[in-house]
Design a protein with these regions (language model features):
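Conserved catalytic loops of ABC-family nucleotide-binding domains
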Residues: 143-152, 160
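ABC nucleotide-binding domain "signature motif"
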Residues: 15-25, 165-166, 174
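Catalytic Walker B motif of ABC-type/P-loop ATPase nucleotide-binding domains
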Residues: 120-123
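C-terminal portion of ABC ATPase nucleotide-binding domains
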Residues: 83, 139, 161-206
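A short, proline-enriched helix->beta-strand linker immediately N-terminal to the Walker B motif
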Residues: 114-118, 147
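Helix-to-loop junction immediately C-terminal to a conserved catalytic motif
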Residues: 8-9
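ABC ATPase nucleotide-binding domain helical subdomain, centered on the C-loop/LSGGQ "ABC signature"
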Residues: 18-20, 28, 35, 53-94, ...
Length: 206
């Protein structure tokens, strides 16, 4: 899954065929352009030395406090950051020891939201979030990033089930595409995943 989405920002290139962004082969696009319009939240949450604000501004050096507040709100970071003594001026300790895994992940998401990218890729990057926070994040993304195409790489059915289109990969191969309801009814691989993760009530509502 990661290999597939890494082709979009051109972290690696296809050997056959092409990957197009807004009608253009990514190999014909300048790297600076791709980095500007495509932001990626990787699996591993990496924050850097400095304050929370310093880290967020890495996503958009020209951002103001309003942009920061927006990114914190959408990423579900606003509440815990507001409770910190120094707020966004809180220094991040070595290896981010003063933050939990979920907090680090949310701040990485906030940084990716900065600059309002046209494409936002989540590479299995909500794994440290509890289900309630994950659901709130997906709701906020849908409500606030109307002009952004969002790719969600996840092993959680609940994370992807409301997506406009789901791609099912099995042993590295694309085996089906469709909506949650379509795939549950027509694809055995997807249905088995659903049955292993969803409650009887959730399955019955499909």
């Amino acid at each position: 899954k990661s290999t597939l989405v890494n082709l979009i920002p051109r972290f690696s290139d296809v050997k056959n065929g092409s990957v197009k962004v807004f009608g253009h082969d990514v190999r014909d696009c300048k790297f600076g352009y791709l980095r500007h319009v495509i932001h990626v939240v990787p699996q591993k949450s990496n924050l850097f030395s400095g304050t929370i604000k310093d880290n967020l501004l890495m996503g958009d050096r020209s951002a103001d406090d309003r942009d920061i507040d927006f990114a914190l709100k959408v990423s579900q970071s606003a509440e815990f950051v507001s409770k910190l003594k120094d707020g966004t001026n809180t220094l991040i300790e070595e290896k981010s020891k003063n933050l939990s895994g979920g907090q680090k992940q949310r701040l990485c998401i906030a940084r990716a939201i900065m600059g309002h990218p046209r494409i936002l890729i989540f590479d299995d990057s909500s794994s440290a979030l509890d289900f309630a926070t994950d659901a709130a994040l997906r709701k906020a993304l849908k409500e606030n990033l109307n002009d952004t195409t969002v790719f969600l790489v996840s092993q959680r059915v609940n994370t992807v089930k409301n997506a406009d289109k789901i791609l099912v990969l099995d042993d590295g191969e694309l085996v089906a595409t469709g909506t949650h309801k379509e795939l549950y009814k027509t694809n055995e691989v997807y249905r088995d995943i659903c049955l292993s993760q969803l409650s009887e009530k959730e399955v019955a509502s499909v």
